[in-house]
Regions:
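Transition segments tied to proteolytic processing and entry into folded domains
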Residues: 1-128
Length: 128
């Protein structure tokens, strides 16, 4: 997942807009984030805009203003579009206390990890 990511960061959604493309273009949703923790391809405090194919939104991949997320994003395509690596696996929810909700695999209870601890573990893994 780390290897396939062009950008890895924790951030807050500050704007969501659907672009009005030319008639022959792909419909795109543009999401703007404020980076809170930068791992790869961005800087802390940076305002980052990504463009996703609007079809992801119909499949349930939606963002809300004020939402805190941790993202593993593919490098932008030739069209400038990106998406989370591994689909939903590349997008983790974060609460207001900056704890990341880990998706349960074997148990029914989601566990959390502090953003700082998760970021440190990712940085170590990226060096290996």
């Amino acid at each position: 997942m780390i290897r396939d990511s062009g950008e890895i960061f924790a951030g807050t959604v500050i704007k969501v807009e659907r672009t009005d493309p030319a008639p022959t273009s792909t419909i795109v949703t543009q999401i703007t984030f404020r980076v809170e923790e930068a791992i790869r391809g961005v800087r802390r405090g940076q305002i980052v805009q990504i463009r996703e194919w609007a079809g992801l939104w119909q499949a349930g991949e939606q963002y809300r203003v004020g939402e805190h997320v941790f993202l593993f994003l593919y490098p932008p395509s030739k069209l400038g579009l990106t998406s989370p690596v591994g689909g939903p696996s590349g997008r983790l929810q974060m609460d207001d206390a900056h704890k990341i909700r880990l998706k349960p695999v074997a148990s029914h209870r989601a566990q959390t990890i502090r953003l700082k601890d998760f970021a440190a573990a990712l940085r170590r893994a990226a060096k290996e």
